């Protein structure tokens, strides 16, 4: 029936009233797709190629790569879920590789892809949580911080435990080392400092938290006796290594980001020693001063890929 008095149209007024009460809580931002600096021409012939990286500043520099991909072997381990979304990398040694499997087992391979040792330091119930591990190598020690709030140190030659501890919240960042301390950030946007020798906590520095779990891995660098890190809501914070007190902090997003952190993505922090560079999926590419946290400039670039610094570029 086309008669609006018919029972077919009975719920029409209720629907219209319901529609009036719908509030849009997030907006879609227009993504700019264009070539950056189209007229710019670069002469890279005088760039010095170096295989050295500055790990505590995430600065890869210019690398010598011929553009060839050649398979030289394969390493077998149980398949990780969401492999396209995670940002975890193996540890490359002079004579082998270290990685982990879906149950949290740490596996060390030699150059011939042969397993040297395989160790799992989780209970049966913890294995079901499929912990994801972040690594840091320091001499004969391998430090691990995982996605189920455990952190520990193992002997890199045997895989045996040196010490093992638990945090209140899971970890979600790189691990950085400075002298006798290691630094890592958990899901509550808290930077934690631990002693290398036994894993005891030196201090922690908490920043604002978000209402949702972040979908990005937080980044850290160390410069001028400060640990500088990103968090889930886009804040960049510098903390004094010895005291754990905040030196400076730069919020890069509005307060509404607290409700939208799952969709917010930011690149790793990269420093040349004077400035810090990073970008995000909000059309923002930043350069900030490493000493003060003040903004040098912002360009419209939509990317969460790690910047690469080559010379003064």
Where are these regions (language model features)?
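Extracytoplasmic beta-rich repeat domains
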Residues: 13, 49, 69-91, 116-139, ...
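Blade/loop signatures of beta-propeller domains
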Residues: 15-32, 39-74
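Beta-propeller domains
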Residues: 60-70, 102-116
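Short loop/turn segments that connect beta-strands within beta-propeller blades
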Residues: 110-114, 155-159, 195-199, 241-244, ...
